[in-house]
Amino acid sequence: MKVYKKALVTGGAQRIGASIAFYLAKMGIDVAIQYNSSEKEMNNIKKKVMNLGVKFNAFQCDFSKDCDFDIFFEKVKKVHGNIDLLINNASTFKFDTIKKTSHKIFDKHINVNLKAPFFLSKNFVEQLSNKNGLVVNIIDQRVKNITPYFTSY
């Protein structure tokens, strides 16, 4: 089994992302996380991970806005080092229906759920320089269990 050394987990401050970050740290992998507004949760996972003796870095970035993912990834690389494991976990899911939605909600879903993983993966592959790496994209059960209440999601 390939042993990864440095991971980036988007949406890594809470829920599944925090669990993934903690698990990777228990495996001895240095962890960087991206979070949006969950600073309290970020500090909680930071304490847990740092108690394991691995390197931890957190990067606040709101993917829902027009984010320059190239600059974000370069910042992560500069502080944390080259990443060999990328977990695209960040997600947003706003309630809307086809009749009650907006460009703002639609753009937020596209930016966080599509653009962020796509462009972070692009940057990840470019920095690998012929080394092996792994990208894991976390998706929601709503991909198969569609409802009319999260239309743009």
Enumerate the predicted regions with their spans.
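Conserved NAD(P)H cofactor-binding loop of Rossmann-fold oxidoreductase domains
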Residues: 89-94
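Catalytic loop of short-chain dehydrogenase/reductase
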Residues: 134-153
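Conserved glycine-rich Rossmann-like NAD(P)H-binding loop of the short-chain dehydrogenase/reductase
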Residues: 29-42
